[in-house]
């Protein structure tokens, strides 16, 4: 009975406390509801993700009275009311949260949701390799959808890791490997070849680098112990990539030696062969320039190239050209007939539209020479096509120097090259008459497109249809490290024939060192059947 009385007393007391508001100053708290965020948001990786938010408060909803925080995978990605960020998130489902905090009261409102990220990188796109705040970065823009935007500096944001510190080149392999030992993209950085997927633009599993182990695993003989693999240059050459035939080469200059691998496959017949050769040094075992080139690269059928045989290099220690037979283990040989260029390095070399005629650019830091060479492309041609220097001209340093980028036309005698703030178009036939490239060959300057005189073209590429030229432009002045927060690397897309501007992308990268139109499928000239252009690219 005593327990019952005590219980009733406590019940009456609780009711009295609840009903009696006394003399306290009660104030209703502003309650915020968050509108316009779906529970599941769909987006493509690296695309701009925009979520405009509407706030509704029981007393006020003035946006200035709140602070905001967007979290994805427990990481803060924005502190603005509306979300506008590049979707540098892993593929698949990502957990997300939007937090609104009342500045005066400190109360919070939450909205939990998920972001389902799909791949936007599997198709055609532009890749820019740059140096930003002293380290390597990649930027990307898809070309398979109209109105898409650049995703600047996506790599570290997506992976949480640095790409490297000394970026040089982007390389593309079109020959798939079952074990991903030779991924579709190679990023040349820190004297190594970092392997990335051509679809996700990040690493595939544990496949991080292509090094001497790749060649050793495919070779028929084992080399002595190798403690380092110091890469100077790389070149992927695809000769065939059809449904019935796959063929291509990878050439690497590392440790001042040539390493190369040829792969030939016919998937329908379960045929997959390779020839791998390693450690082919100069006859003098000197220092090799980071450049290699062919005497000829001729088309075969509607999509293929004929397989090459002789690859040309330059020994800086001896100042002489040498050649390697890429189809045998034979030692590299000297091209003494081409002369000695003591103190020079080979800055650039290429075959041209004319078979057995190549161009080489040499430099010693103050003098730059352009050579027009007649060279055999096969050992069987050596007697009929002797090693010959057709022309040797001095080129002004303001026209060609160590920072010049080049592109030879596939079927014409013209070469485009970019130096500092100018783009040049030069007829290689002029070399035969001893006429060096000069200011008369300049067809545009950056000032034509609103740039300052100290802005520079730092790299360039041409679409495979040769309809567009893409220029990587630095607005960093003399800063080649891309320091500071502001991105000052641009991409300018021009019509190759008219030089009219197609698009200008500002602030999409750090200091650009290389750019590439990343095609998902190999088409030699962008023509599906060898006749009709099939590329549809939304620059």
Residue ranges and their predicted role:
Residues 365-490:
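Intrinsically disordered, low-complexity segments enriched in Gly and acidic/Ser/Thr residues
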Residues 162-168, 343-344, 394-401, 449-459, ...:
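Repeat-based blade/solenoid architectures
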Residues 13-16:
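C-terminal motif of bacterial Sec signal peptides marking the signal peptidase cleavage site
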Residues 130-216:
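Beta-propeller domains
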Residues 180-405, 426:
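Preference for solvent-exposed, low-hydrophobicity sequence contexts
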Residues 18-158, 465, 474, 478-499, ...:
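Acidic/polar, low-complexity intrinsically disordered N-terminal segments immediately downstream
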Residues 2-10:
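Sec-dependent signal peptide recognition
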Residues 123-125, 182-183, 246-248, 355-357, ...:
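Short coil/turn segments that connect the beta-strands within blades of beta-propeller domains
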